[in-house]
Swiss-Prot record:
Quaternary structure note: Monomer.
Annotated organism of origin: Macrococcus caseolyticus (strain JCSC5402)
Protein's job: Catalyzes the specific phosphorylation of the 3-hydroxyl group of shikimic acid using ATP as a cosubstrate.
InterPro entries associated with the record: P-loop_NTPase, Shikimate/glucono_kinase, Shikimate_kinase/TSH1, Shikimate_kinase_CS
Protein name, entry field: Shikimate kinase
Sequence positions that bind substrate: 32, 56, 77, 133
């Protein structure tokens, strides 16, 4: 069973996932990084050449391949755009929704050329997407954590939760 990090782009899933995996002594896989590795292309180039639908299929295949492994797995913010992913994630025991303030998110992603769904978007457009996705993150989350403050506190909160769950 994977410990799956879900949440909007720019909330810190990859950074948290790396730290959490080290703390738990597990392998860490970031789905976006895995796609880039397998395709030998950047996400933005996959979007440009093949489109979002193709990217979402790749994303689903990576999720399906790794969700039953004992790892920490970071998803892309749009993982919940595919209903098949929602189904897979609902079957997984521990999905961790990482959230943070929309202003913080916007400042992190607004000029990031590696985020095709954020490039050249206004604050209102990003905010609309953020709020549209929130209910789906909540639907699949077993626990939610806020990454507004210290990163180490967020990682420790998740770690404590996992240790407590393993004891039950």
């Amino acid at each position: 069973m994977a410990y799956v990090l879900v949440g909007f782009m720019g909330v810190g899933k990859t950074t948290i996932g790396n730290l959490l995996a080290r703390k738990l002594g597990l392998k860490f896989i970031d789905i976006d990084e895995q796609i880039e590795l397998e395709m030998n292309m950047k996400i933005k180039d996959i979007f440009e050449q093949y489109g979002e639908t193709y990217f979402r299929t790749l994303e689903h295949n990576i999720l399906k391949q790794h969700i039953n492994m004992n790892i920490v797995l970071a998803t892309g913010g749009g993982i919940i755009e595919n209903p098949n992913n929602i189904s897979l994630l609902k079957e997984n025991k521990i999905n961790i929704w990482v959230d943070t303030n929309i202003n913080t998110v916007y400042n992190r992603i607004v000029n990031d050329v590696n985020r095709p769904n954020a490039m050249n978007k206004s604050f209102d457009a990003i905010k609309d997407l953020y709020f549209r996705r929130r209910s789906r993150y909540n639907e699949i989350a077993y626990i939610s954590v806020n990454n507004d403050d210290e990163l180490s506190d967020c990682v420790q909160e998740i770690h404590n939760f996992i240790i407590a769950e393993e004891g039950n």
